[in-house]
């Protein structure tokens, strides 16, 4: 895989230069992860190609598609797929051990409504995801880039929000974000309030309680015990 970069923006959210949003990180796979990659990739893995996907062809049905960017080790994604067999789940992750772990868990769970990719998310969106096709886009706990001088590297920017909007089903699709970094939550709200074609679906304030469909991770549960917050945000595509 060639090296990729993230996008960098100015204070107005305008693209300054392309530095890809995710970098493919190779890592050492455990034997279990390696076996899962070999055994499960033919049925659950999707190779990158500059060609739009046909969701019915990918999953064998017309069920709603939930896409997650950066699923980590995949435990939550597998749990969501197991709990919602009436939906299709599509995960993109650049860390190959995470993809292997996800496939291993998916095999153990016996689910068939999950597909995964190991590639740069922006390239996948640009070349493979059909417009107006996603029921939900999930972005859970992305890199917060804590230092102020690095805030421009955060994936949630106006151009990214527009890219997501184009892929969501009109007047129906949901962009669901979650972060445990309050400053990033505020940044997400600021960007999404500026992004055209969206409406915050929170009934009171900017944030929503953790939805039942998003599993509570071990890391998150530990954070709760220590008094750390987590902010869930949902915006609906309205135009």
Swiss-Prot record:
Pathway: tRNA modification; N(7)-methylguanine-tRNA biosynthesis. Substrate binds at residues 147, 180, 217-220. Its EC number is 2.1.1.33. GO terms for molecular function: tRNA (guanine(46)-N7)-methyltransferase activity. One of its GO terms (cellular component) is tRNA methyltransferase complex. It is an enzyme of class 2 (transferase). S-adenosyl-L-methionine binds at residues 68, 93, 120, 143. The active site is at 143. Catalyzes the formation of N(7)-methylguanine at position 46 (m7G46) in tRNA. Belongs to the class I-like SAM-binding methyltransferase superfamily. TrmB family. This is tRNA (guanine-N(7)-)-methyltransferase. It comes from Vibrio vulnificus (strain YJ016). The gene is trmB.
């Amino acid at each position: 895989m060639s090296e990729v970069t993230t996008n960098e923006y100015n204070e107005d959210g305008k693209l300054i230069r392309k530095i890809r949003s995710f970098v493919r990180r190779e890592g050492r796979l455990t034997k279990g992860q390696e076996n899962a990659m070999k055994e499960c990739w033919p049925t659950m893995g999707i190779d990158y190609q500059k060609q739009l996907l046909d969701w019915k062809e990918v999953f064998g049905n017309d069920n709603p598609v939930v896409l997650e960017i950066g699923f980590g080790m995949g435990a939550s994604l597998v749990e969501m797929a197991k709990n919602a067999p009436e939906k299709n789940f599509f995960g993109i992750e650049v860390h190959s051990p995470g993809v292997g772990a996800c496939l291993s868990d998916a095999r153990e769970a016996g689910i068939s409504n999950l597909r995964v990719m190991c590639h740069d998310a922006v390239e996948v969106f640009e070349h493979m995801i059909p417009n107006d096709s996603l029921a939900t886009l999930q972005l859970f706990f992305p890199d917060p880039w804590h230092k102020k001088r690095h805030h421009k590297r955060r994936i949630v920017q106006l151009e990214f929000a527009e890219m997501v909007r184009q892929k969501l089903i009109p007047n129906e699709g949901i962009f669901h974000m979650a972060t445990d970094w309050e400053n990033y939550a505020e940044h997400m709200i600021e960007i999404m309030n500026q992004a055209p074609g969206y409406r915050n679906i929170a009934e009171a304030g900017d944030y929503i309680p953790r939805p039942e469909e998003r599993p509570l991770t071990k890391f998150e549960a530990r954070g709760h015990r220590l008094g750390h917050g987590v902010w869930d945000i949902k915006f609906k595509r309205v135009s």
